[in-house]
Amino acid sequence: MELGLERIFSAHQALLQSAYESTIVHVAGSNGKGTLCATLAVHLNHLGKSTVMFTSPHLVRVEERIRINGRPIDVQAFDQCLLQIRSIELELGLKLTFFEITFLVACLTAHREQASFFIVETGLGGRYDATRILPADAAVITSLSLEHRDILGDTLAEISAEKAAIARPGKPLIVRQIHDETAISAIEFEATNAGISALGEAFGPADLNWIEIPDGATFQQEALLLAKGVFAWFNLNTDDLQASVRSLRWPG
């Protein structure tokens, strides 16, 4: 696996010549990422906000990775994006990965749709994940555990640092409270020293917000509490959040 953001950053810059109209929410974590993304999207739709959501993997069709207001992108629109991306690959002499290509389809879709919110799930880690190139307005971290140790590190602190590197200067970093002191310190360090200069970001602190979640909470219970933290930041009403979630059908 290749680590680094230069290739995807170059392709993204070439494809999208203007800024996003969307508020971008970036979600990382070991488990529960997709559930949180779906919870955010369904309530935003309930509030009358348009959404584009990018998650992975898909269960049946690749188009499931990109959802417009909860529905997978249609095949024709997906294929049209592929043609644009292939043109950029040839122009810049790049060979993008499957994940990078599907992510760029989501970016093109959010940009074209001028969605109110673009909700994006990381693929692996955070610091070097392709999705890190986005100018996110909020970052969220779900539960953390030892995973992908060959890539992210051998300890919970190392893994936590890689995921917390999605923090953006001056923006909220909303994190499920953990009780490992070394992991807490790693997250606090990344939040204090947020920003990647190669992406044009200035260095500075993120606004770290810990969300207490009971032990044994299900992914949906976790998602509800984290979603409330996100919506509070954007001053969005959560009175009907439970009702929104009851209409959600999220496989996996």
Model-predicted regions and their roles:
Residues 40, 106, 185-188:
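Aromatic/hydrophobic pocket-lining residues that form π-stacking "cages" and hydrophobic walls in ligand
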Residues 52, 251-252:
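A short linear hydrophobic-aromatic micro-motif
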